[in-house]
């Protein structure tokens, strides 16, 4: 039975990244009616930031020479570490149970929201490998950051996540489904580019629905 873990990081109840993620999830669930769907709203139910006890667990993993994910609980020694592990364990269980990980996120200040970064920090330990799990990012950004655009070098949303998943999770084929120029909906300075945004948004929704039928 395939499992989809769906994370949302936008604080908006109605947002473009949520819309794109929902298009993928709805298509996935319709195509796999017996699949298991897990949704975690990182904005509505924030994950705590890592603390000193978490770093001690991470140090123990390094000292042990690698990440045997099944053995992680045995590295917990102190009451503070046990409290830290109680935060990590359900998050990591959801991640490891997933065949497909879907992340809906806006671009904030050229990067990702703190809510998503907090989740990444909690579930990431040295030398992990999550391959062959498939990762899909449903992304929105207020401007245009595609290759060849004037602000392409400012994109630390896709670049960061792509590097993170490759470097920490050994997942090198993350797919990004992105709607650009979202600020054209509100910013008079971008009003002339509203049609570009609308086309980008529509294409992202179509792509998300198609991928939702294909990914298992």
UniProtKB/Swiss-Prot annotation:
Catalytic activity: 2 a quinone + NADH + H(+) = 2 a 1,4-benzosemiquinone + NAD(+); N,N-dimethyl-1,4-phenylenediamine + anthranilate + 2 NAD(+) = 2-(4-dimethylaminophenyl)diazenylbenzoate + 2 NADH + 2 H(+)
Family assignment from sequence similarity: Belongs to the azoreductase type 1 family.
Gene name in the database record: azoR
General function of this protein: Quinone reductase that provides resistance to thiol-specific stress caused by electrophilic quinones. Also exhibits azoreductase activity. Catalyzes the reductive cleavage of the azo bond in aromatic azo compounds to the corresponding amines.
UniProt enzyme class: oxidoreductase
Cofactor(s) annotated in UniProt: FMN
Chain positions recorded as FMN binding sites: 10, 15-17
Top-level lineage group: Bacteria
Native species: Nocardia farcinica (strain IFM 10152)
Keywords: Flavoprotein, FMN, NAD, Oxidoreductase
Enzyme Commission no: 1.6.5.-, 1.7.1.17
Gene3D superfamilies named in the record: 3.40.50.360
Binding partners and assembly: Homodimer.
Family matches, as SUPFAM superfamilies: Flavoproteins
One protein family per Pfam: Flavodoxin_2
A molecular function GO annotation: FMN binding
Protein name: FMN-dependent NADH:quinone oxidoreductase
Cofactor binding mode and count: Binds 1 FMN per subunit.
InterPro entries reported in the protein's UniProt record: Flavodoxin_fold (IPR003680), Flavoprotein-like_sf (IPR029039), FMN-dep_NADH:Q_OxRdtase_AzoR1 (IPR050104), NADH:quinone_OxRdtase_FMN_depd (IPR023048)
């Amino acid at each position: 039975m395939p499992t989809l873990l769906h994370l949302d990081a936008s604080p908006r109840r109605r947002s473009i990244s949520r819309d794109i993620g929902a298009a993928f999830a709805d298509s996935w669930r319709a195509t796999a009616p017996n699949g298991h769907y897990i949704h975690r709203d990182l904005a509505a139910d924030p994950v705590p930031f890592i603390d000193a006890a978490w770093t001690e667990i991470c140090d123990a993993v390094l000292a042990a020479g690698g990440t045997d994910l099944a053995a992680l609980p045995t590295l917990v020694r102190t009451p503070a570490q046990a409290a830290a592990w109680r935060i990590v364990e359900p998050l990591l269980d959801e991640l490891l149970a997933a065949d497909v990980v879907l992340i809906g996120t806006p671009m904030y200040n050229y990067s990702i929201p703190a809510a998503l970064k907090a989740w990444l920090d909690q579930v990431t330990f040295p030398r992990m490998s999550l391959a062959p799990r498939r990762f899909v990012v449903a992304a929105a950004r207020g401007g245009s950051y595609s290759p060849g655009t004037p602000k392409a070098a400012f994109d630390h949303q896709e670049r960061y996540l792509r590097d993170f998943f490759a470097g920490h999770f050994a997942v090198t084929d993350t797919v990004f489904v992105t709607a650009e120029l979202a600020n054209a909906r509100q910013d008079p300075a971008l009003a002339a580019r509203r049609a570009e945004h609308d086309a980008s948004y529509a294409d992202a929704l179509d792509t998300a629905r198609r991928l939702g039928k294909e990914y298992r």
